[in-house]
Amino acid sequence: MKRVVTLVSKEQAEVGHRFRVFSVPDECKSCRLFSVCLGRLTPGRSYKVVEVRPSMGQRCKITDSEMVPVVVEEAPIVGLLPLNKALEGVVVTYEDECAGCEGCPNDVVKKGEKVKVVKILGRKKCRNKEFAIVEFFVVSAPSHAVLDSSKTAQAPSRAPSSRRPLK
């Protein structure tokens, strides 16, 4: 799991604390601490504090609260993938097949991003299609190498062509 050092408020600086970054306020982008604070995190993703480091007295420009350095790891995303892509340990290209379904992770994963399935949690039917409810991590951004003026390159899915159905 990817770990990164960032800053959180003193109240959030507890091992095991989980939080989600929804967006980055404009005021943060001009702060001298941005590159070691929210600048290291991805909006839409969830994180878990795994280590608290000694405070160095930094203060938040917006809240004026004490900021504490912590080590966080990205928490897995829970969302829907087509059954043929849902196999633990497999890296697949997210194609947005579940758009419009409750539980579809469109707000945190972009079409074309590579995701690694870490756990299968169950099944769900939406729009007459079967999906697996899975935990996964984004492992790379979408590929944008131009093939010609109308197409972009996409790596083929490494999902197996056939597999046992989920129980």
Swiss-Prot record:
Alphabetical list of InterPro entries matching this protein: UPF0179
Pfam families in the record: UPF0179
PANTHER family associated with the record: UPF0179 PROTEIN MJ1627 (PTHR40699:SF1)
Sequence similarity: Belongs to the UPF0179 family.
Protein name according to UniProt: UPF0179 protein Pars_2336
